[in-house]
Amino acid sequence: MNSLTKSINLDKVSYPQSTVKDYILLMKPRVMSLVVFTGFSGMWLAPNSLHPFISVIALICIAIGAGSAGAINMWYDRDIDALMKRTQKRPIVRGAIEADEALSFGLIMAFFSVFFMALCVNFLSALLLLFTIFYYICIYTMWLKRSSIQNIVIGGAAGALPPVIGYASVSGSVSLDSVILFLIIFIWTPPHSWALALFCNDDYKNCKVPMMPVIKGALYTKKQILIYSVLLFLTSLMPFFVGMSNIIYLVIAAVLGLVFLYYSISLFYDNADNKQAKRFFAYSIFYLFFIFLLLDFCRV
């Protein structure tokens, strides 16, 4: 049985009873937790404030919306997930959840997340949440991911919108502050994802997903990571210069950014194995979390 037949036959396997854990995994909990955290930062950094109960509802809606997008992404990508070592244990691939069941679950969650955001919070945040879900599923997952080398650059906008949604849920508007939060994640996403693609290159090549290392090679990808790392360093300092944060943020963000640059330079000159790419990938996760944590604690 070849790879294509194996992936097509996923829809014909006998499925065991699904568990709560399977549905949690279907929602990509690691991604969802980062989405909720950055969404909270957007709420915290907004000039106004919400009633605590409404704030919790907004965060739940953001979480459910992110989970719905993750579930539909797994439904659509089940064929290539079956071919990649990194994703072969996902619920649909290993037969824990049926494909149609996953799609229904994702669509229902998407509807309720947007509906309750509009009903309980405000229309703008609901509209932004709907756009984010649509963008991630239709623009990134169904179109760009398998067709463009710039898939993660353009598609990364979806992952950068949660703080904008959080900000809008409190203020009812989109401002320069929320755009800067968007830009930090938007510029962070390509180097983070390309580092992953460097040490998962064989998987992406096998699935014919046009990630940059597959199409342009490792050296070109490392150059792009370095360029984006410089842009990220500059962008991460913007909150101080527009009055969002204090001098403590500026100093620590600069140090974190310099370390990010150090890892990207080390990666560029590394010709051995994938260890440096894995180190860079791990640090990039820590970096984004700590930058937003700093913004929360150092807001003006």
From Swiss-Prot:
Matches recorded under Pfam families: UbiA (PF01040)
InterPro entries xrefs: Protohaem_IX_farnesylTrfase (IPR006369), UbiA_prenyltransferase (IPR000537), UbiA_prenylTrfase_CS (IPR030470), UbiA_sf (IPR044878)
Coiled coil: none
Subcellular location: Cell inner membrane
GO CC annotations, alphabetized: plasma membrane
GO biological process, one term: heme O biosynthetic process
Topology of this chain in the membrane: Multi-pass membrane protein
EC number in record: 2.5.1.141
Keywords linked to the UniProt accession: Cell inner membrane, Cell membrane, Heme biosynthesis, Membrane, Transferase, Transmembrane, Transmembrane helix
Gene3D superfamilies cross-referenced by the UniProt entry: UbiA prenyltransferase
Pathway participation: Porphyrin-containing compound metabolism; heme O biosynthesis; heme O from protoheme: step 1/1
Additional observations: Carbon 2 of the heme B porphyrin ring is defined according to the Fischer nomenclature.
Task performed by this protein: Converts heme B (protoheme IX) to heme O by substitution of the vinyl group on carbon 2 of heme B porphyrin ring with a hydroxyethyl farnesyl side group.
Name listed for the protein in its UniProt record: Protoheme IX farnesyltransferase
